[in-house]
């Protein structure tokens, strides 16, 4: 029975290194579908099986909305550390680390370009920058963008994706809620449209200010929208919240939103809204000099 002792070597690959690059596939956190990266990008980071909306970066958001190229403004503004704040690490160090990892100076990008052939001012928030939190720079850039829109008679689109006011900047961050809201009031008096797009998540001081002040408040499907998070609310009231509470569909049903729109249809919806409220085009770039 010597043949029992015969051991054959396993078949070896001619190339022992894997030929499949890392990061080529993405697993959907909702349905566990494995999606090819290029297919996901082609669908604007929406799952091709269950329509789960992955988060977009600010740059990806601008690419999904503008017709082509755009001009970014106030690129040099960056946060300082006025309170010398320290939690688990100094705020100054946290800023340095985040700037290095994201390649951005703060949590919002403001730009002008065209949507559906019309000049528009767009602000897109970046969640990977300290949770998209709103500090002095975010408030200043959005306010300048709104003022530019008023000067050049252009509509405004703000895409929110934020955990709220930035606690490391204390009352200075809370002031931005009033500052942006006041700028939007001036935009309203100028009879220029403001479209607010709420994405997952939009919470805290951002929800309590400019995110809910749009002439049209549009949310992406299943986006978490609220002031305090559901876990905090449950711990405070000691009750279980209803199914889907603080999700965009729940808010639409209860009159807090105008519509819930799939990301793949968002640009067309915004284009139609802008057509209804369009004004004649004004000459000149939407650039505003720094205020003292």
Task: Please report, for each region that a protein language model flagged, where it lies by residue.
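A generic structural signal for short coil/turn motifs at secondary-structure boundaries
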Residues: 37, 130-134, 166-169
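Glycine-rich anion/phosphate-binding loops
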Residues: 97, 101-107, 132-147
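Structural motif
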Residues: 38, 125, 159, 197-198
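A structural preference for short, pocket-lining loop segments at secondary-structure junctions
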Residues: 115-124, 141-165
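Intrinsically disordered, low-complexity segments enriched in small/flexible residues
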Residues: 1-104, 112-115, 273-292
């Amino acid at each position: 029975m010597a043949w029992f002792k015969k051991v054959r070597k396993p078949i070896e690959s001619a190339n022992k290194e894997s030929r499949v690059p890392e990061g080529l596939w993405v697993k959907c956190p909702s349905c566990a579908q494995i999606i090819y990266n290029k297919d996901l990008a082609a669908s604007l980071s929406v799952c091709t099986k269950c329509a789960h909306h992955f988060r977009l970066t600010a740059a990806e958001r601008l690419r999904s909305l503008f017709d082509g190229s755009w001009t970014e403004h106030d690129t040099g503004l960056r946060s300082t550390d006025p309170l010398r704040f320290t939690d688990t690490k100094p705020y100054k160090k946290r800023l340095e680390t985040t700037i290095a990892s994201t390649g951005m100076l703060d949590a919002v990008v403001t730009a002008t370009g065209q949507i559906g052939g019309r000049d528009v001012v767009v602000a897109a928030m970046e969640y990977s920058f300290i949770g998209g939190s709103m500090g002095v720079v975010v408030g200043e850039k959005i306010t300048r963008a709104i003022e530019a829109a008023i000067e050049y008679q252009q509509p405004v689109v703000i895409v929110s994706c934020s955990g709220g006011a930035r606690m490391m900047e204390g009352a200075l961050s809370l002031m931005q809620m009033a500052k942006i809201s006041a700028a939007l009031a001036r935009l309203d008096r100028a009879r220029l449209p403001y479209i607010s797009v709420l994405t997952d998540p939009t919470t805290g001081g951002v929800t309590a200010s400019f995110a809910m002040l749009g002439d049209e408040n549009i949310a992406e499907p299943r986006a978490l929208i609220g002031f305090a998070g559901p876990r905090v609310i449950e711990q405070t009231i000691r009750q279980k919240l209803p199914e889907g509470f603080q999700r965009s569909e729940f808010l639409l049903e209860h009159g807090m939103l105008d519509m819930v729109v799939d990301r793949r249809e968002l640009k067309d919806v915004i284009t139609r809204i802008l057509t209804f409220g369009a004004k004649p085009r004004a000459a000149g770039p939407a650039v505003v000099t720094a205020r003292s």
